[in-house]
Amino acid sequence: GMAKAQSVRVARTETGRALSQAGLDSAMVAKDNGINMKKRWYATKDTRTRDTHRHLDGTSVDIEDNFHSSGCVGPAPKLFVGVASAKENINCRCKLLYYIDEDELPTVMRTKEDGVIPFTTYRDWEKEKRKGSA
């Protein structure tokens, strides 16, 4: 059998994959009904976020377009395919924000350490953190 830590990791990853696919499926139904949506990658703002997902944070694409990372391609977090897809998908905490107009996007976000702060990309958040600790 599997060790407990491994089974928790698999359950967390597969639950996340199902949620990610469900969100994508819902957005595709909206598109099929004439609603033109976009999707924006949203990475968790903490030091555990993998480097390959930090650069995707804040990237917007059309609903049927893919994101690219480490030679892998996928329509949403936890849905990458390719030679390194396990490294891209396992324990990923990223999400997508679906929207019609840019002005619908959030203006604030919550981080574990800072509470509610102005909405920012991972890279800008990281720069602010470095400035604050200097």
Residue ranges and their predicted role:
Residues G1-A5:
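Short, basic interhelical loop/turn and adjoining N-cap
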Residues R12-A134:
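Activation/maturation switch segments at domain boundaries
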